[in-house]
Amino acid sequence: MFKITVCLLTFNSERTLHDVIPPLLKIADEFVIVDSGSTDSTIYICQSYGLSPIFKKYSWHGEQMNHAVSHAHNDWVLCMDSDEILDQETVDAILKLKRGDEPEPDMAWRICRHWFVLGENVRTIYPVSSPDYPVRLFNRTQSRFNNRPVDDQVEGFLRSERIPGYVRHDTFYSLHELFNKLNGYTTRLVQYQTIRPSLGRGAISAIGAFFKWYLFSGAWRQGKVGVVTGFYATAYSFLKYFKAWYQDREKRESVAKEQSDSYLAE
């Protein structure tokens, strides 16, 4: 038998918390919440369940998760986002796992995660197909999230298995939320990864993304929400190159201005 610390990230999560927290409470021997500055009723809802969030200014997802894990007193951690809702089969499977012998620390477990966009189960959401199977339960002495600014993953484990059941990932509940995340993801990507500053490459990448993530994936069969996920993939693919190009132009103009000012001052 072994204990599990649940690590949960929140930010303006009032819409989903009443669905997210109760299943996790059935599993948790300890509950760590890291909030990145919610301005809605997120903190109040957490406190109504007897939970006290820790504040950490948001940098990127993996760093937030590792911060939550660092506050865990148990070696085994279940790391979840505040828009991921466990079903009862997953809860029962984890409780059964806890009652057994403690696994080796190089072991990890994956969840079956179904993505919901605008309330509908989708086939794809760039850059993953739905469902996907991220590692969510692992030993913190062996594994941790990597430092990728977007699309981070757990690293360090040697073996993994799937947990029965599934998780509902209730993401992008509105177009406003989708555009906010699209802007945030692409900005962080350009800030922390090297993207070739090319409008031509951006256009080609966007066209390829449209064919792959809208036509070939079958998203076109899903009507309105399929158009949304196809647009998201297309816009994401173009924006990362456009922002890299714009950032590069600003740097070039700044250098040219400094050189011009220096020449005039001589």
Which positions does each model-derived feature cover?
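Cell-envelope/extracellular polymer assembly enzymes that use nucleotide-activated donors
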Residues: 3-5, 30
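Short, well-formed alpha-helical segments that are part of the catalytic scaffolds
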Residues: 7-27
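Acidic helix N-cap motif at the loop->helix transition within catalytic regions
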Residues: 18, 40-49, 89
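A conserved acidic beta->alpha catalytic loop
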Residues: 23, 27, 35-44, 81
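Conserved donor nucleotide-binding strand/loop of the catalytic core
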Residues: 29, 43-71
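Catalytic-site signature of metal-activated, phosphate-bearing donor transferases
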Residues: 63-69, 76-80, 87-251, 259, ...
